[in-house]
Regions:
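Conserved HGGG/HGGXW glycine-rich cap/lid loop of the alpha/beta-hydrolase fold
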Residues: 4-56
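Active-site loop/oxyanion-hole signature of alpha/beta-hydrolase fold enzymes
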Residues: 32, 41-42, 46-82, 244
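Flexible "cap/lid" loop of the alpha/beta hydrolase fold
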Residues: 96, 103-132
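Conserved alpha/beta-hydrolase catalytic His-Asp/Glu region
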Residues: 136-189
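Short beta-strand/loop motif that positions the catalytic acidic residue
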Residues: 192, 198-200, 204
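Conserved alpha/beta-hydrolase "acid-adjacent" motif
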Residues: 205-211
Length: 251
């Protein structure tokens, strides 16, 4: 499996894992500041970008092996791990499978999955139902806007829309990744020992904000940082604040 990755900066290793339909470009707003403090590793998940796109469906556990492959190829035995959305589910599988490879864990806008998962917000359910009837670019624009919070920075929706057009996901790869979002480690997360921070926007229309409370109740000692009024892509809405929160937690 060829997994495309890059490394920026020095310091303690920090692995970033993106979510559904986003390549490693999805971390761009926070890269410069993080790279001043850490050796930042980011990669394209299988099914997107410059990484291989094997036939799906994928599981989050399979995608976690890709993340471990990046650590191996980078010569990193142990790293801090930040995962967003589907990337947060992958990060959970990673730390469950190889707890010795994870120093501290940051789970962003994500879920533990399973029967206790709070339901997807109605706005996103309606959008998924309506999207097939819309012009593809209109649907994409709606999905971009839906992933932002109550008062996003001026021009951010335009910027993200343009980037999504420049970096279209492979349709089969997107479907294969989406299938991974239905897989989860189950009871195993109750034994996660890595210090864990859960970061969640209170206006997330994609992942129900109540998922943060469920995760915190499952992972021993987990801390929660709620970002008032921010949406699913809060690290695009307020990148500086996110870097500060993560850096203070990681040390």
């Amino acid at each position: 499996m060829n997994i495309a990755w890059d490394s920026t900066g020095d310091g303690a290793p920090l692995l970033l894992i993106q979510g559904l339909g986003y390549g490693r470009w999805g971390w761009e707003p926070i890269m410069q500041e993080l790279a001043e403090r850490y050796r930042v590793l980011r990669f394209d998940n299988r099914g997107i970008g410059e990484s291989d796109k094997p036939a799906g469906p994928y599981t989050a556990a399979e995608m976690a092996t890709d993340a471990l492959q990046v650590l191996d190829e980078a010569g990193v035995e142990r790293a801090h791990v930040v995962g967003a959305s589907l990337g947060g589910m992958i990060a959970q599988e990673l730390v469950v499978a190889e707890p010795g490879r994870v120093d501290k864990l940051v789970l962003c806008c994500t879920t533990a999955g399973g029967p206790d998962m709070p339901p997807m917000p109605e706005a996103t359910v309606k959008l998924f139902m309506e999207a097939p009837t819309l012009d593809p670019q209109v649907a994409l624009r709606r999905f971009v806007e839906n992933a932002l919070g109550e008062s996003p920075p001026a021009g951010l929706a335009d910027e993200l829309f343009a980037l999504r057009l420049q970096n279209p996901p492979d349709p089969a790869g997107w479907q294969a990744q989406a299938a991974a979002g239905t897989t989860f480690p189950g009871a195993a997360i109750d034994s996660i020992a890595a210090p864990t921070l859960i970061v969640q926007g209170t206006a997330d229309n994609v992942v129900n904000p109540l998922n943060a409370e469920v995760l915190a109740s499952r992972i021993p000692g987990a801390q929660i940082e709620l970002l008032d009024g921010l949406g699913h892509l809060f690290f695009w809405e307020r990148p500086g604040e996110f870097v500060r929160i993560v850096s203070e937690f990681l040390g």
